Amino acid sequence: MSERRSVDVPIGTPLSRDEFEAAIRAVGAERYHDKHPFHKLLHGGKLDRGQVQAWALNRYCYQDAVPRKDAALISRVHDRELRREWLHRVLDHDGLPPDEPGGIERWLVLTDGLGLDRDYVISMKGALPATRFAVEAYVRFVRERPLIEAVASSLTELFAPSIHRERIAGMLENYDFISDDVLAYFKRRLTQAPRDATFALEYVKKNAKSRDEQEACVAAVGFKCDLLLSLIHI
């Protein structure tokens, strides 16, 4: 688990809600994966088709893990309001056919558009072992760590919309094998991620009462940033 970030408040004193949120956002400002050189190459059209395929193939492991970690979180929750709120995350990714295909299906539309065999993508046989290990570590984190930390680990969604906007614009401009339709996953996340992040942030700010709990939540965001970085070391 990532080292807990220090905050300029006396040890043991709980942070104010604003200080706590600032500490969470500082993790993203320093460690979110949008700063990795890979994304500059991807969005700038500097990768060949095979490299883009490798990224999408590898990333599918994460897409597959997301509804499983959300279901794991729901299974631990006694609060009906939180369960109801979190349930839509599972449906966002798994879909509710025929009207809502879901995020996993949208990712497969991307890999289809890149020329990858769908069954091969779903099998995850072509993904790096380190990627499979990392995403399963995320599922275990959400299943086993205190609930407040499990919720906090989702807060990288606070930082996601900007990278999605950059990706949509950059890939459409720079790759002739990318069309508007295959980027539907990222377009949908422009509205889903802020909604989810707003709820999770308020939940964490309300329920992390002690300084130790607050620091653990900040560390959980750092853990998730490390996970996302591991997915692009391909």
Could you tell me what each predicted segment is?
Residues 4-7, 20-47, 66:
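Short alpha-helical hairpin
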Residues 13-20, 77:
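Anionic, Ser/Thr-rich low-complexity intrinsically disordered regions
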Residues 20-21, 26, 84-185, 226:
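Active-site-proximal alpha-helical scaffolds that flank and shape metal-associated catalytic sites
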Residues 37-48, 66-88, 167-179:
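Helix-loop segments that flank and shape redox-cofactor active sites
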Residues 44, 51-58, 149-152, 185, ...:
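Non-transmembrane, amphipathic alpha-helical segments
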Residues 51-101, 105:
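Extended cationic-aromatic binding surfaces that line active-site or macromolecule-binding grooves
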Residues 185-192, 202-229:
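C-terminal, helix-dominated tail/subdomain
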Residues 232-234:
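Conserved small/polar residues in nucleotide/adenosyl-binding loops
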